[in-house]
Amino acid sequence: MIRRLLPRTLRARLTALIILSTAATLALSGVALYSALHNRLVGMSSYEMSATLAAMRTHLANVANVDDIPRKSDLWIDQLHGHQNLDLAIYDTDGRLRFATRGFVAPRPALGAPQTRVPASAAPAGATFSYLADDAPLRGGNPRTARIVVQYDGKNDHALLRAYAYTVVVIEVLAVVLTAALAYGIAMLGLSPLRRLVARAEQMSSSRLAQPLPELDTSGELKEMEHAFNAMLKRLDESFVRLSQFSSNLAHDMRTPLTNLLAEAQVALSKPRTADEYRDVIESSIDEYQRLSRMIEDMLFLARSDNAQSHLAIRTLDAAAQAERVAGYYEPMAEDADVRIVVRGKAEVRADALLYHRALSNLISNALNHAPRGSTITIECAQAADAATISVSDTGRGIEAPHRERIFERFYRVDPARHNSASGTGLGLAIVRSIMENHGGTCGVDSEPHVRTTFWLKFPAHAA
């Protein structure tokens, strides 16, 4: 409800909130101060009446009987010296008035009745007077008590409270008006770095993403927002660069088989051919078609993975047994390349079986492409408390450090000379990374050139 009432702009909202909080604080302060002053005045009036009543009781104790009360009027008047708001009266036990000062106004009859306990007080509704009454013993005579009634005129106190309330209201209204002006200026000043940030952001374009926003002369939340915005620009720039490289590599990789297909078709049609020659052309074209098909399938898989559209059938797998199964698919290729594939260790992974096979298959295929003849490809399964690690190692020429960070990027190849190789699409390792991200795991590579290269997959104990 409050959000709907607040202005939409941040500047107006800050101004309104400052005004509202200031007005509420001033109002509460004014009420508290008014209450404190009122209580103070009530306390002072009660003290004056009680003190005067006590003094009157002391003096009446020396009076012989009620008939002597009117004769000592000067004494009773002296008790009010310095108490300009007080008046008093003395009654006998029959309720007859024996003495009263000039400003005394007769109270309700109950105050004139005899009292046996604590002093009685009263404040008639709508009147400014308040009363305190009590019985006082006399020295002798009959009756032996007299009734004292002390009157306090609160007219001056009420006038003071009204003037104070009026002054407080005027001051608070002026303070709110001044606060509104100051709040607007403070909001404008406080949001000036944000306006500069907005102006700079409006100038951004895809060609200027690499240029960070200027440093703001501020700290705190705006500084954090500036850093977050610059970090976002950096990520966007990196994404645009990768997208540009991806588009370039994709165009180049698709152009090669299309060029081959076109060239073969043109050569085949340049003159009459025998059936065997046409068969050779068609078989060669099929290889290029298959390469294009694999590339498109890999790209579709990555697109589905990036958009989280693939459904994972997560279950517990025997990592070593599944690795043996995948390695069996590559035994014929390994025999042709004179390479052995060995599976070691034991571990359990929480993964989608098909995707686990595909990730491991891509790593084994990659290792076969680089393993020297007569060498061994080792698949190692290791179990830890928080994760299971599956690694594929070969003893090929290895990967230099500058290439390791980018080896899992799409279409990235360490050896440009192999760029047009028909052995792969350049998306195998990118697919591996996508599969691991979908499982909440990680992948990486450790390589010592010309000694050993190990690609590893780390599956968390509880898959995402």
From Swiss-Prot:
The keyword DNA damage does not apply. It catalyses: ATP + protein L-histidine = ADP + protein N-phospho-L-histidine. Gene3D superfamilies: 1.10.287.130, 6.10.340.10, Histidine kinase-like ATPase, C-terminal domain. It is an enzyme of class 2 (transferase). It comes from the Bacteria. Residues 35-166 are cytoplasmic. Residues 188-241 form the HAMP domain. Residues 249-463 form the Histidine kinase domain. One of its GO terms (molecular function) is ATP binding. It is a multi-pass membrane protein. SMART domains: HAMP, HATPase_c, HisKA. Its main location: membrane. The modification Phosphohistidine is found at residue 252. It holds the Pfam family HAMP. This is Sensor protein IrlS. It comes from Burkholderia pseudomallei (strain K96243). The lineage of its organism: Bacteria, Pseudomonadati, Pseudomonadota, Betaproteobacteria, Burkholderiales.
